[in-house]
């Protein structure tokens, strides 16, 4: 049995694909009020996978459900992750596996510190999904999941190889460099989509030389943590592949949700400061993005 915590776009995407594959799961929503909202709709989700629309009836419960949890996929926003997992502490079995799908860095270590008896895995996700309404989900970009242990030496769970082909997954024993590279790409794209209120593909033209300056500084931050990357190539490849997409950070802004800015760009700026690096372009980017959120 897999439990999914969080009924946002990513949590629903996991639930939809597990449902289609016939894998036993439960989607944990925030509270009884949210559960009643789903129940009133027959727990139905209209899932557009890019090829067809499917109407699925999801298996949903609340944190108060007493059933034990052995495998938990945490699909909340980074700032909400620790408190959300904490609400399930009485249900977590000794040695439970926690799979953390959060953007950026910082929230994963906070959970690992609070749940020392759990196996902690980090997942770098490149799927794109968004909700035109509460009970609709569009799988906008088919991506990949790279999974690895936060604590070195933790073995992969047995069921990882049993996931359906729709959940493309690989195991990476050293996950931190993967998370750092994704963080750096997010830093180079998402804040600009806030500042200019634009889609990903418009960032190079709007940002101009500022983008290149930020990439160069991010490359230094990665190097200070022993992470190799051709960051400029990766950033422009992502921009090209997601040109028509609205970044998750921009979506949060438009929906008046809290963003994860402090967990990627804020984290990168703090890491640069700790390493004694001068990053004027990134510092300016953070201030401008924060201004855009006000």
Predicted regions span which residues?
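Helix N-cap/beta->alpha junction signal
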Residues: 31, 103-104, 265
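Rossmann-like NAD(P)(H) cofactor-binding subdomain of soluble oxidoreductases
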Residues: 46, 51-136
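NAD(P)+-binding Rossmann beta1-loop-alpha1 motif at the extreme N-terminus of oxidoreductases
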Residues: 1-52
């Amino acid at each position: 049995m897999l439990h999914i915590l969080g009924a946002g776009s990513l949590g629903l995407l996991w639930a939809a694909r597990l449902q289609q594959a016939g894998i036993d799961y439960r989607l944990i929503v925030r509270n009884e009020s949210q559960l009643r909202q789903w129940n009133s709709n027959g727990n139905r989700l209209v899932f557009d996978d890019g090829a067809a629309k499917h109407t699925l009836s999801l298996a949903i419960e609340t944190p108060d459900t007493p059933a034990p949890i052995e495998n938990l996929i945490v699909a909340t926003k980074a700032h909400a992750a620790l408190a959300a997992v904490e609400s399930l502490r009485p249900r977590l079995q000794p040695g439970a596996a926690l799979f953390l799908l959060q953007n950026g860095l910082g929230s994963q270590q906070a959970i690992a510190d609070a749940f020392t008896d759990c196996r902690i895995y980090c997942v770098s996700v490149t799927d794109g999904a968004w909700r035109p309404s509460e009970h609709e989900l569009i799988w906008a970009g088919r991506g990949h999941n790279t999974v690895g242990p936060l604590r070195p030496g933790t073995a992969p769970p047995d069921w990882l190889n049993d996931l359906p082909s729709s959940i493309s997954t690989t195991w990476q024993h050293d996950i931190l460099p993967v998370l750092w590279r994704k963080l750096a790409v997010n830093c180079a794209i998402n804040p600009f989509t806030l500042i200019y209120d634009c889609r990903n593909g418009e960032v190079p033209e709007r940002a101009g030389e500022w983008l290149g300056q930020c990439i160069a500084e991010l490359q230094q931050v990665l190097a200070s943590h022993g992470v190799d990357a051709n960051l400029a190539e990766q950033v422009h490849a992502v921009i090209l592949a997601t040109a028509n997409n609205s970044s998750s950070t921009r979506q949060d802004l438009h929906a008046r949700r809290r963003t994860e800015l402090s967990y990627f760009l804020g984290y990168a700026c703090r890491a640069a400061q700790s390493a004694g690096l001068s990053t004027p372009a990134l510092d300016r980017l953070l201030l401008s993005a924060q201004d855009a959120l006000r």
